[in-house]
């Protein structure tokens, strides 16, 4: 069936990902070469930096769909939602952009500032039948060397580790955290977070590390079975 990638910035001209249509196609080529058959496109929703109009996002999705060929992964629209003032307003109005057709949505938080009441809000999301998905948990300083908090958040949230971090490309501290989450069984899935073609080369190194250290069954679980569970609204064990 192939891999399912929950996090990427393939759509051109909406954030810090692909700058133009050719770059989007180059990313699709590289994603296909990595073995990905379903690609979630998750443009930033970040008030301080990237907040593209949703009509523009949808038009860019249509444009990339028109460029996509049979060899490329299918596309599913989502968003990478920064936990900021806009996110709080969207909680109140129930307007958080989800992975299309699912109860799951991707979130990120500031690296050095855990949002107040985050654990309680994650619980509320789950009680409402929603599945929050935390992007790159290895980046968040408050989770470093804090297993109690890490496990508390993990109870109501799917952790999706960046493959580039696993491969050691995002810093030594992030690599240590990413690998610990995998080895301790706290990572639900892995993703590329691809912004450019070079990110896929880093992702391949991360996959090779998982294959060597944890076995190929772990690669399949983290990059195929678990992402499909998440898109079905299920929190993987």
Language-model segments: what does each one mean?
Residues 3-6, 39-42, 76-80, 133-135, ...:
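Active-site neighborhood of phospho(di)ester-bond hydrolases with catalytic His/Asp-centered motifs
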Residues 32, 126, 182-183:
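Non-catalytic positions within long, well-ordered alpha-helices that form the structural scaffold/packing
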Residues 51-160:
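Extended substrate/RNA-proximal surfaces in nucleic-acid metabolism proteins
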Residues 23-27, 60-64, 121, 149-153, ...:
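A general structural detector for well-ordered alpha-helical segments in enzyme core domains, enriched
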Residues 1-71:
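An N-terminally biased module of ancient metal coordination in phosphate/nucleic-acid-related enzymes
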Residues 204, 208-237:
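Mid-to-C-terminal alpha-helical segments outside catalytic/metal-binding sites
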Residues 46-49, 82-84, 139-143, 166-169, ...:
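Active-site environment of divalent metal-dependent phosphoester hydrolases
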Residues 186-202:
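Short acidic/histidine-rich active-site segments
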């Amino acid at each position: 069936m192939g891999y399912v990638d929950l996090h990427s910035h393939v759509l051109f001209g909406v954030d810090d990902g692909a700058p133009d249509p050719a770059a989007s196609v180059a990313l699709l080529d590289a994603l296909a070469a990595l073995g990905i058959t379903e690609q979630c496109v998750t443009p930033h929703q970040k008030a301080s930096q990237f907040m593209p109009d949703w009509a523009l996002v949808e038009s860019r999705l249509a444009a990339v769909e028109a460029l996509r060929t049979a060899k490329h992964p299918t596309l599913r629209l989502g968003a990478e939602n920064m936990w900021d003032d806009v996110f709080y307003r969207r909680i109140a109005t129930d307007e958080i952009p989800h992975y299309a057709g699912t109860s799951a949505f991707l979130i990120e938080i500031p690296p050095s500032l855990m949002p107040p009441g985050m654990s309680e809000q994650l619980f509320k999301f789950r009680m409402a039948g929603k599945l929050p998905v935390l992007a790159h948990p290895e980046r968040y300083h408050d989770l470093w060397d804090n297993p109690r908090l890490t496990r508390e958040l993990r109870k109501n949230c799917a952790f999706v580790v960046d493959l580039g971090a696993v491969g050691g490309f995002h810093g030594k501290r992030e690599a240590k955290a990413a690998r610990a989450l995998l080895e301790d069984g706290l990572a639900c899935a892995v993703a590329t977070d691809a912004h450019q073609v070079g990110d896929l080369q880093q992702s391949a190194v991360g996959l090779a590390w998982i294959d060597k250290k944890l076995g190929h069954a772990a690669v399949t679980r983290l990059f195929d079975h678990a992402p499909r569970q998440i898109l079905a609204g299920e929190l993987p064990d």
